[in-house]
Structures are given as C-alpha cells and as structure tokens.
UniProtKB/Swiss-Prot annotation:
The processed form derives from the membrane form by proteolytic processing. Residues 16-52 have a biased composition (Low complexity). InterPro entries: Glyco_hydro_22 (IPR001916), Glyco_hydro_22_lys (IPR000974), Lysozyme-like_dom_sf (IPR023346). This is Sperm acrosome membrane-associated protein 3. GO terms for biological process: fusion of sperm to egg plasma membrane involved in single fertilization. Sperm surface membrane protein that may be involved in sperm-egg plasma membrane adhesion and fusion during fertilization. It could be a potential receptor for the egg oligosaccharide residue N-acetylglucosamine, which is present in the extracellular matrix over the egg plasma membrane. The processed form has no detectable bacteriolytic activity in vitro. It comes from Papio hamadryas. It is a single-pass type II membrane protein. PANTHER family: LYSOZYME C, SPERM ACROSOME MEMBRANE-ASSOCIATED PROTEIN 3. PROSITE patterns: GLYCOSYL_HYDROL_F22_2.
C-alpha cells in the first residue's frame, strides 16, 4: 500500500524559465503543470510530441513545492500509523507478556486469573474502549476507567496513575 501511495505521489514537473518578460508578477521557479520549454515556443519551430518529451527530459525535472509538502505529510503519517494500530493478543501471547512483567502471583492472583480477566473485559484487545453513562471511558486490555485512574483530558479527574488513558 505504501508503494502505491509513493507511486501516486511522485509528481515530477518540467523546469520552467526563471523569469519571462511576457509574464507579470513574481518570477516562478517551478511550474506545477506541464508545458513546452520557452526556447521551443520562441524559436517558432514546430515539434512533434515525441520531440517535446525528449527535450523535456533533457531539461531536467524538479519537484513541485506542493508535492514536497504532500510527500512529507504522507511520510509522517505512514510512520505514525503502525504505532497506533490495535494489538489483539492471543491467549498464550498475552500470558507470556504478563509473565515477563511479573504478574504471575502478583497480589495473590495467578497468571490464569489475569488472562481470564483480560479475556472477559476486552477479548485481549489492547485498544478496547468502552463508554460509560457518566462520560468516562474504560480503556485497554483490563478496561482501566478514566474516572479515577487515567486522564482523557477531562477536567477535575484524580488521575491516580498520572498517565493518559490512550
């Protein structure tokens, strides 16, 4: 998908003259449209389409500033998307993660208890989100409530864990 986006966004344009006596206003460094070179049109000679294409390639190509900004934006978004994708764990995968974090036997609860809790609260979905009637949200695998434990930018919330819910 990313390669298709890059292919669609690779907008190359032909170079245009820096200034032209017949054009009013500030000189344009790059034209975002396709045009024949001014040397060909000023000479009065007629060229075929293939001759124009060959000469256009020889003149060099430049990026349109709007295309550069669009490419930068798409690059930034493509870097951020994989980090925001939801992770849905398998039962064994979640058990390994919880064991690595030392939750087996934590406060008297076995690893099976933690896995059972995660299954029935979120279905092992790390991005699970449930809205309560009071406006608070239950977040993540263990459905931590934003009313007391985390902040979802609601004013006057205790935020005991001192972290954002997202």
């Amino acid at each position: 998908m990313i390669s298709a986006l890059w292919g669609a966004l690779l907008i190359r344009v032909h170079s245009s003259p820096v200034s032209s006596p017949s054009v009013s206003g500030p000189p344009r460094l790059v034209s975002c449209g396709s045009s024949q070179s001014s040397a060909l049109s000023q000479s009065g000679g007629s060229t075929s389409t293939t001759g124009t294409e060959a000469r256009s390639r020889a003149l060099g190509r430049r990026w349109c500033p709007a295309a550069i900004m669009l490419l930068a934006l798409v690059s930034l978004l493509s870097c951020l998307l994989p980090s925001s994708e939801a992770k849905v764990y398998s039962r064994c995968e979640l058990a390994r993660v919880l064991q690595d974090f030392g939750l087996d036997g934590y406060r008297g609860y076995s690893l099976a208890d933690w896995v059972c809790l995660a299954y029935f609260t979120s279905g092992f979905n790390a991005a699970a989100l449930d809205y309560e009637a009071d406006g608070s949200t239950n977040n993540g695998i263990f459905q931590i409530n934003s009313r007391r434990w985390c902040s979802n930018l609601t004013p006057n919330v205790p935020n005991v864990c001192r972290m954002y819910c997202s």
